[in-house]
Amino acid sequence: MTEEKIQSYRKKIYVIRQKLKAKKPRFLRYDSDKFFRLGRQEKWRRPYGRDNKTRLKVRGFPAIVSVGYRLPKEVRGFHPSGLRQVIVHNVNDLVKVQNQKDSVIVTIASSVGFKKRLEILNKARELGLKVSNEGVSA
C-alpha cells in the first residue's frame, strides 16, 4: 500500500471508531448518581438485586454492559491519533516494533520503573518511534 492509501485507511477507521464510541453509553454503577460513595467508584458493577430495573433492562433506566457494545475487531486497539497502540515493557520490545514505526504508537507499561523508562524513552527517540505516555523528560 502507498502512504496515501494507508493514511486514508487509518483516517477511515478512526472515523468509524469515533461514531461507534459516540453511540456507546457510559456504564456507571447503578444509583451512583444518588449515593456519593457509589459515584466516586466510577466503575461498572453488575446489578444482582431481585427487583433491580437496570438488571431487568427496563426502559428509562441505565443500559447494562453487554456483548453488543463491543467495537469491531478492525477498529479495536487504536490510539486517538489513529495509530495502533503497542505496550512496551523493555528495550527489546521496541526493537521488535521498529520496522512498523509509521503505523504504531508505543505506550510504556505502567509496571516499568523510572530507570528502565528512561532507557526506553532514549531508545524510542533513537529509532524515531512515537511514545504516547512519555511523562518524563529524559
Curated annotation (Swiss-Prot):
Listed GO CC annotations: cytosolic large ribosomal subunit
One example of a Gene Ontology biological process annotation: translation
Keyword terms of this UniProt record: Ribonucleoprotein, Ribosomal protein
SMART domains tied to this protein: Ribosomal_L32e (SM01393)
Presence of the UniProt keyword tRNA processing in the record: no
MF terms in GO: structural constituent of ribosome
Similarity comment: family membership: Belongs to the eukaryotic ribosomal protein eL32 family.
Name under which the protein is recorded: Large ribosomal subunit protein eL32
